Amino acid sequence: MLMPKRVQYRKTQRGRMKGNAQRGTAVTFGSFGLKAMEPAWITSRQIEAARIAMNRYMKRDGKIWIRIFPDKPVSKKPAETRMGSGKGSPEFWVAVVKPGRVMFEADGVPREVAVEAFRLAAKKLPIKTKFIVRPDYEG
């Protein structure tokens, strides 16, 4: 599971997901990418499930890059707890993903294999996604 080794603050405010992604919108490492079309919190478990689905389909061929990292702690109070008495303890970690963000990249496999691998990965994510190809890709 992905999570930071250490953080400056144990708990963060929830924040808002306004607008589109400003950075990380282009395929830079691989030839193919999976782009987010909606804003969402993607948990470390969802990222891991998508990674495993892609790796299983691609077997040993190719390389995968994960372009998002869950660096935001989400706190939760225990069940059946009265209101008040402070903020709950951090339960899990999320990556804040805005529309246009490239979440995963792949290289070293044919286009058809990449399309299917990303389709399987997209099923593990709670948002609409889009398969994109690097502009200078020849294949």
UniProtKB/Swiss-Prot annotation:
A single BP term in Gene Ontology: translation
Biased composition (Basic residues): 7-17
Xref: InterPro entries: Ribosomal_uL16, Ribosomal_uL16_bact-type, Ribosomal_uL16_CS, Ribosomal_uL16_dom, Ribosomal_uL16_sf
Keyword Metal-binding (UniProt): no
Record-level GO cellular component terms: cytosolic large ribosomal subunit
CDD domains: Ribosomal_L16_L10e
One GO MF term: structural constituent of ribosome
The organism's place on the tree of life at top rank: Bacteria
Record-stated family: Belongs to the universal ribosomal protein uL16 family.
NCBIfam families reported for this sequence: rplP_bact
Record's subunit section: Part of the 50S ribosomal subunit.
Protein name from the UniProt record: Large ribosomal subunit protein uL16
